[in-house]
């Protein structure tokens, strides 16, 4: 199951999650948290509409009653109320694998947009996660570090987030760190591993973070170890970026079919 928002272009959010699940051979269900559209007449600004909390709770109840879930991925929540609704449901469900993509802002938004959800996410969702996949900005927020400039900083951030949450961490450096490679750091309390792939450009690609967390979720559901899941997810996303889709949007979108195309 993914608990995430719908992004109208299909490049990120719940649609990216479901496409990733299908590409990796698992069945996905969806509890929708919000609907994100853009304003093409105003620099593609975000238009976010939350799903009513009772409607969200009804979706979560339906899915948890219908299936014995192997893994749950949590994506865009968007508000303290939504975080509370989802956290309450996850406490009751207690999934074996709960993968948290700690989305604080949508791509293109300013960091200040995260302030009203930051503390709620840390207090209510992070303690429930078994695996967390923060990007550069989210790693700063969750670790309490003032800056992450290189791989050593990213390692420290991953260790801090694990120490505070107990979750396995895959901290994403992506294109934010200098150098020829897109570097992520895996840490589970004992194993520290740097996952690296050559960069494809220097600009973030929409859907990469969503697809990475969804790929981890899919692989865990299939029985992979956390490290195996992280390695496969890294390869999946790297292939999707190599086969990314251009459009009239101010950013490209990852294509989930890239992994199979390169197989």
Place the predicted regions along the sequence by residue.
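Short pre-catalytic strand/loop immediately N-terminal to key active-site residues, enriched for Gly-Thr
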Residues: 3-9, 193-206
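Conserved N-terminal subdomain of the carbohydrate kinase-like
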Residues: 1, 18-109, 259
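Phosphate-handling active-site elements
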Residues: 24-29, 192-193, 219-233
């Amino acid at each position: 199951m993914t608990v995430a928002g719908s992004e109208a272009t299909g490049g990120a959010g719940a649609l990216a999650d479901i496409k990733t699940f299908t590409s990796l051979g698992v069945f996905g269900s969806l509890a929708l948290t919000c609907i994100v559209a853009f304003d093409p007449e105003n620099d593609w600004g975000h238009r976010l509409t939350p799903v009513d909390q009772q409607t969200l709770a009804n979706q979560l109840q339906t899915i948890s009653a219908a299936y014995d879930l192997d893994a749950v991925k949590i994506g865009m929540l968007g508000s303290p109320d939504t975080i509370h609704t989802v956290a309450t449901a996850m406490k009751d469900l207690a999934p074996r694998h709960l993968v948290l993509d700690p989305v604080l802002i949508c791509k293109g938004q300013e960091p200040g947009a995260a302030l009203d959800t930051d503390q709620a996410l840390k207090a209510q969702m992070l303690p429930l996660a078994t695996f967390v996949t923060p990007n550069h900005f989210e790693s700063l927020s969750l670790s309490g570090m003032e800056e992450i400039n290189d791989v050593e900083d990213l390692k420290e951030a991953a260790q801090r987030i694990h120490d505070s949450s107990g979750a396995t961490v895959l901290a994403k450096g992506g294109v934010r760190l200098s150098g020829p490679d897109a570097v992520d750091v895996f840490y589970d309390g004992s194993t520290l591993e740097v996952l690296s792939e050559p960069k494809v450009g220097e600009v973030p690609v929409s859907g990469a973070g969503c697809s990475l967390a969804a790929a981890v979720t899919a692989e865990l559901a299939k029985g992979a170890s956390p490290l195996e899941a992280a390695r496969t997810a890294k390869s999946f996303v790297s292939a999707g970026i190599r086969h990314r889709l251009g459009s009239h949007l101010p950013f490209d979108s990852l294509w989930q079919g890239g992994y199979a195309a390169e197989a």
